[in-house]
């Protein structure tokens, strides 16, 4: 995401945007630069999600609480206008799917619920930056494909799962980047001082806190999960250019005995598809 010159525009990322709603503000119009020219900071991200939510009936913006450094953990609930008008009913109907006593629920017209979480590790920034493009596309595109998607989907968009870590990284990277981009991995921009920005305020790896659930950021995510019980959970990470991409199921011998074999079968199918 950050190997580009400053001349890129939205069409570089999104293709033809001629059918986009012009009343929906672009990321650049709010944060002051094109996505990818600089690392978006959490304060600029917060500004954009608040502003763009004012102009669309497709989104409900939720302030879930604040981190240890007093940054807001935002959740954008994005779906069609008609679904927004009955969002609580949709949520309650969806939760009934988890009730084993309800075996004959008609799901033919029930939207799927998808949670999309970005950058739980603060120095894996492409997720949060890409989320700006996704939220703009979902709120501005008037294509029939997008309308159909939103009519059949409730998207729980969590643009920054680690606000404090992401802020720490964006400040470091923007302070140390060159006007002429330097691809050398030894450049100061790519080598943060300890404790770096992977962690939250207390230097804890939030990707290890889903089960112990000790930290505010994890509490807020799990609260969203239990309120909705989404059909699909996505957790967008980033890996270095010299690394192979990790997919479950991983090494079979390391499987927790409490994890079902079905989980192994499903994740292997997903990994095989992407491979």
PLM regions and their residue ranges:
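A non-catalytic alpha/beta surface segment that caps or lines the substrate-entry region
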Residues: 42-82
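Loop/turn elements at helix/coil->beta-strand transitions in domains of secreted/extracellular proteins
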Residues: 56-59, 71-73, 110-113, 151-156, ...
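The substrate-binding groove and active-site-proximal loops of carbohydrate-active enzymes
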Residues: 33-39, 120-125, 202-215, 222, ...
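Divalent metal-coordination and catalytic microenvironments
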Residues: 41, 70, 119, 157, ...
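Active-site-proximal loop/hinge segments that shape catalytic or ion-binding/gating pockets
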Residues: 214-274
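Bacterial Sec-dependent N-terminal signal peptides
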Residues: 1-9
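Surface-exposed loop and adjacent secondary-structure segments within mature catalytic domains
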Residues: 8-19, 74-80, 90-96, 101-104, ...
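Acidic/histidine-rich, surface-exposed loop or edge segments in extracytoplasmic proteins
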Residues: 17-37, 116
């Amino acid at each position: 995401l950050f190997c580009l010159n400053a001349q890129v525009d939205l069409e570089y990322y999104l293709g033809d945007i001629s059918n986009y709603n012009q009343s929906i503000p672009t990321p650049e119009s709010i944060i002051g630069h094109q996505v990818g020219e600089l690392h978006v900071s959490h304060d600029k991200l917060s500004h954009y999600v608040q502003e763009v939510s004012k102009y669309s009936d497709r989104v409900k913006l939720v302030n879930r609480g604040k981190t240890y450094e007093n940054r807001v953990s935002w959740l954008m609930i994005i779906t069609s206008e008609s679904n927004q008008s009955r969002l609580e009913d949709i949520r309650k109907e969806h939760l009934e799917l988890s009730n084993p006593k309800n075996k004959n629920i008609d799901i033919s017209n029930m939207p799927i619920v998808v949670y999309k979480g970005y950058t739980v590790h603060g120095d894996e920034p492409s997720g949060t930056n890409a989320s700006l493009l996704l939220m703009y596309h979902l709120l501005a595109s008037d294509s029939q494909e997008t309308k159909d998607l939103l009519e059949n989907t409730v998207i729980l968009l969590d643009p920054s799962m680690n606000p404090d870590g992401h802020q720490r990284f964006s400040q470091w990277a923007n302070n140390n980047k060159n006007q002429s981009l330097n691809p050398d991995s030894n450049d100061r921009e790519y080598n943060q001082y300890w404790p770096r920005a992977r962690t939250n305020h207390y230097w804890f790896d939030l990707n290890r806190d889903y089960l112990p659930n000790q930290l505010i950021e994890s509490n807020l995510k799990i609260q969203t999960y239990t309120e909705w019980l989404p059909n699909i959970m996505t957790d967008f990470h980033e890996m270095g250019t010299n690394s192979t991409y990790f997919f479950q199921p991983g090494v079979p011998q390391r499987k927790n005995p409490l994890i079902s074999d079905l989980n192994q079968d499903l994740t292997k199918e997903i990994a095989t598809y992407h491979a």
